[in-house]
Amino acid sequence: MSFSQEPIPEVRSEWSIAAHGPDTPFRHWTVMQKYISDLIQRNGYQDYVEYNTTVERIEKEGDQWKIILRKEGAESDYWWKEYFDAVVVASGHYSVPYIPYIEGLEDLELQRPGSILHSKMYRGREAFRGKRVVVVGASVSAADIAVDLAGVAQSPVHAVVLGHKANVYFGDVAFKHPEIKEQRSISHIDTSRTVHFEDGGRVDDVDHIIFGTGYSWSLPFLPGVEKDPTLLFVGAVGAGLTFKIFEWQAVLAARILAGRARLPPLEEQQRWEADRIAARGDGGGFTLVFPEFEAYFETVRALAGPGVEGKGRQLPKFEQAWFDAFMAGHERRKALWKRWNAEGRRAKL
């Protein structure tokens, strides 16, 4: 899902072609990294970026925002402050791993440092070859890792998925591999490295527990969510057709700050929020765009408008083909898992 005027390069890895065919829609992470880097560097945009810098705090002072910044130095860190008329928070929400509380988990990590990790830290199967592994999570990260370890880690790979809701796109097909054993939630872990499950089952001498349990929303630099018209958030959504949804939001945010677009009265915005909470709840479902892609994209496009005197990027109308391609990619992934499952079953004959 590229930006509307900047197509993603047609560079496909040998692995992706072998797995999904010559028309594979998937790209290696290095291709995506270069895609984003090239966008920043064109037209001198990189001159507006302060690299290797953390935002430590944002707070409103009068009619401006005070930003406290920090850059690491060889002997000491350099701290400074700058002032801005507006702030756009576009820091994402896949940074701080979420690991649920499990009795004995912290003790296991203290006893065997490195035995507990999150999918964010997973860098391939070789570190787990011949190891006894438990994978926790019922969504795509846990599925990818469990399948990747099947036939490499000690068999079976134990996947904590039973009793948990499967990912709406992928279901539970990945966990049906013959080298994966589905388990219920972990009740506790004892000092002998035994993982106990809620149904009374257990796995002894566990080497690693890998969590594919998502991320926590974190804004440590913003001590309180300010209700201020000059504080905007871009990308605070889930399941929303990356990168297009970021583009739509960014265009709207830029036009609001430039005075070329206006939001409706506050009362109407509050009604939007109330209606969405009533329909989706105030948890993770609140931020999910799926399956209402067209309604969301067209609402944002209408709010952004064409800009004053045609200035700025013109957002195209939502195309059903975008959604179809999005879903087709998921079907390719499921087809790959089914093929691997079948190969695994044949290997056991």
Residue ranges with predicted function:
Residues 230-349:
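C-terminal, flexible cofactor-proximal segment of oxidoreductases
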Residues 14-86, 91:
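Feature captures the FAD/FMN-dependent oxidoreductase FAD-binding
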Residues 51-66, 70-72, 101, 121-122, ...:
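A conserved short coil-to-beta-strand element within the FAD-binding core of flavoproteins
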Residues 3, 131-138, 224-241, 251:
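Short FAD-binding loop at a beta-strand-to-alpha-helix junction that anchors the flavin cofactor
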Residues 55, 79-95, 133-136, 205-214:
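Short hydrophobic core segments
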Residues 28, 32, 63, 86-149, ...:
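Glycine-rich dinucleotide-binding loop and its adjacent helix/turn
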Residues 1, 102-109, 218-231, 240, ...:
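FAD-binding beta-loop-beta segment adjacent to the flavin cofactor pocket
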Residues 1-38, 62, 224, 231-232, ...:
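Glycine-rich active-site loop/strand segments that organize a redox cofactor
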